[in-house]
Amino acid sequence: MSLEFTVVIPARLRSTRLPGKPLLLIAGKPMVQHVWEQARKSGASRVVIATDDTSILEACQAFGAEVMMTRADHESGTDRLAEVAAYLGLPADAIVVNVQGDEPLIPPVIIDQVAANLAAHPEAGIATLAEPIHEPETVFNPNAVKVVSDKNGLALTFSRAPLPWARDTFAKARDVLPEGVPYRRHIGMYAYRVGFLHDFVSWGPCWLEQAEALEQLRALWHGVRIHIEDAIEAPAVGVDTPEDLERVRRLLEA
């Protein structure tokens, strides 16, 4: 029997670095349409776009997507997912996968992977993905979120800072990584149990989440387990800047 799960794609117009991002055209289609089409190639039983903007709503309706209007005042994307799950009436044990609306090249296989990861680990409220880091500059880049997990694959913590801090190596130089230390970059795709989403909303943000601007820290703060696997396929480039947009356009318009 195949695993049943729902994909939700949050899509908002407000972006400081790339205004109007979900509706920017790539190969003649809005960016969010590319994401939706990739998600539909996964094993998801349902793919829903969640937005708080009528222009996105109308664009998504035009290409045939299931789309829902949500409140505009959510603290995080996870809060938005909780609203969608409640509106759809999903049961507490249902699995919802959050696929970011700015990843038009997202591999469908890793959407399936993160859902299966959560289904295989009933002790976890969240599952997510990571990939190895091989370059020192990525370790020191605050836009690359680092993650450390325990021997069972459960997250210990996430940080924008270098994690772990290799004291002896970094005291001498920061252009080389220490041997035997598995640095990993977090991939911002999550699978959640709906029951967890309802709890998440009721808690509100914690100081650690706000300091790092990482909403998954709210879950760890409250003792929720997050299971992590390395992605079976390298995730494609997301679109955060005009340079990213041009790179993706070249790939899809070639």
Swiss-Prot record:
Pathway(s) annotated for this protein in UniProt: Nucleotide-sugar biosynthesis; CMP-3-deoxy-D-manno-octulosonate biosynthesis; CMP-3-deoxy-D-manno-octulosonate from 3-deoxy-D-manno-octulosonate and CTP: step 1/1; Bacterial outer membrane biogenesis; lipopolysaccharide biosynthesis
EC top class, as a word: transferase
Keywords per UniProt: Cytoplasm, Lipopolysaccharide biosynthesis, Nucleotidyltransferase, Transferase
Subcellular locations according to the entry: Cytoplasm
Pfam families (UniProt xref): CTP_transf_3
Gene Ontology cellular component terms for the protein in this record: cytosol
Principal cellular location given in the protein's record: cytoplasm
Protein name listed in UniProt: 3-deoxy-manno-octulosonate cytidylyltransferase
Source organism of the structure: Pseudomonas putida (strain ATCC 47054 / DSM 6125 / CFBP 8728 / NCIMB 11950 / KT2440)
